[in-house]
């Protein structure tokens, strides 16, 4: 916007014969902004990646992208729950400022996001797939939406599919937190079908020509439960996966708030009764989860190849980002899913690759999901949205000493006995402190 105004003022000061020269000069002096592709998954445990050192989970495409980019190995969500974490990422504000703590929260339409900032400097901001928006506004700064969501009907060609996808229709409750281990194994699922449609839409879009610089966000629902992987990938992990050492954690290891999150039973499909979750169930869930991650990695490889072709075809520079809204403990500490400040739930993968990003670099300083938007604005000279709680990660690319003492916050509103207990986590250096209000137990360090 500012560039446009400056150009307009300059043109008004020139004679007709000079206008063409001024326009050419202005356009040639303005640095080209990189196109951006941001793959944003749902519920990917940050430590279940090859590039993070996991010995079993295979993620060759992400590993290759990470080796040619910068990895933030201590990145965290602002809230270990979908809508609050995603709202924080888009707005750059903590849940205590967005006032969104549950999956029913709605971002006000007059709330600025980093997409608005990118749009103001000429970007076409495109949403392909999941963002878990609630309410009538399904854009929040996106100028185009080429694929709808699976849990909320939005714009795009496949937004209505959720009504026809079996387990996400009449059996929706069975794949929520309470029933996440009721369905697991190898096969097909609404998650796999939805993500396939998301990737098809992304590949189709990247096969087209676009005049404006692009910021494309590809949102997948995988590897969110139900824990169902393609059969071949489930078999690959089924006999190799182990039960986490922390599965049987008891006593002082748990804060009272996390003790209540332990998954002790599942529903017997034949009788409908609650039965104890066995170690075999844990292995099955983890084998499927690992298979879903590898499946997602394959899809990322496909879209990355199309992205590289798009950049080459249009002679443009590109920036690639991968992250997730939160993690999944998947049996660690006896818990499945999110809702806690354990590393498996609160930590997120965060990788930058491409224009302006160092290769083969790992940053150990803590980073937050609320830093992503500010970083993209910084890398593209876009104005930052107002009232930001985060900070650009760009200084971390150059080993700025001021970044060594970074700290990040994560917030969660725990529901307990018909009351809410707000909790906070702070990570600085190698320490993490967790505390809940209205708790009968002190914080954990």
PLM feature spans:
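Intrinsic-disorder-associated, low-complexity terminal segments enriched in Asp/Asn/His/Tyr and depleted
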Residues: 1-3, 12, 16
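Formylglycine-dependent sulfatase
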Residues: 5-9, 20-443
């Amino acid at each position: 916007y500012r560039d446009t105004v400056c150009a307009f003022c300059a043109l008004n000061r020139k004679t007709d014969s000079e206008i063409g020269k001024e326009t050419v000069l202005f356009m040639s002096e303005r640095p080209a902004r990189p196109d951006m592709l941001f793959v944003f998954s749902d519920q990917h445990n940050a430590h279940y990646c090859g590039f993070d050192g996991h010995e079993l989970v295979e993620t060759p495409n992400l590993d290759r992208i990470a080796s040619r980019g910068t990895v933030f190995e201590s990145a965290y969500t602002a809230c270990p729950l979908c809508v609050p974490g995603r709202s924080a990422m888009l707005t750059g504000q903590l849940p205590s400022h967005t006032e969104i703590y549950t999956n029913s929260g709605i971002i006000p339409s007059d709330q600025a996001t980093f997409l608005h900032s990118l749009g103001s400097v000429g970007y076409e901001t495109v949403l392909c797939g999941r963002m878990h928006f609630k309410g009538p506004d399904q854009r929040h700064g996106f100028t185009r939406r080429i694929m709808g969501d699976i849990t909320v009907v939005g714009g795009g060609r496949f937004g209505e599919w959720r009504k026809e996808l079996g387990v996400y229709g009449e059996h929706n409750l069975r794949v929520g937190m309470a029933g996440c281990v009721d369905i697991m194994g190898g096969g097909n699922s609404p998650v796999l079908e939805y993500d396939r449609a998301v990737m098809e839409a992304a590949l189709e879009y990247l096969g087209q020509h676009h005049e404006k610089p692009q910021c494309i966000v590809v949102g997948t629902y995988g590897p969110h439960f139900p824990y169902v992987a393609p059969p071949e990938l489930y078999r690959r992990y089924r006999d190799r996966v182990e039960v986490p050492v922390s599965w049987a954690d008891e006593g002082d290891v748990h804060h009272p708030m996390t003790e209540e999150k332990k998954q002790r039973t599942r529903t017997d499909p034949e009788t409908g009764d609650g039965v104890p979750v066995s170690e075999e169930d844990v292995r099955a869930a983890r084998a499927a989860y690992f298979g879903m991650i590898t499946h997602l990695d394959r899809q990322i490889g496909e879209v990355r190849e199309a992205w590289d072709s798009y950049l080459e075809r249009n002679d443009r520079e590109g920036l690639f980002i991968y992250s997730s809204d939160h993690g999944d403990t998947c049996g660690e500490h006896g818990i499945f899913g999110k809702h806690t400040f354990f590393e498996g739930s609160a930590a997120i993968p965060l990788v930058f690759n491409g224009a302006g990003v160092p290769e083969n670099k790992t940053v150990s300083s803590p980073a937050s999901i609320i830093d992503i938007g500010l970083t993209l604005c910084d890398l593209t000279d876009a104005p930052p949205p107002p009232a930001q709680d985060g900070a650009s990660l760009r200084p971390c690319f150059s080993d700025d000493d001021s970044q060594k003492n970074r700290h990040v916050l994560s917030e969660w509103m725990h529901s307990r006995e018909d009351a809410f207990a707000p909790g906070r986590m702070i990570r600085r250096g190698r320490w993490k402190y967790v505390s809940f209000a209205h708790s009968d137990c002190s914080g954990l360090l």
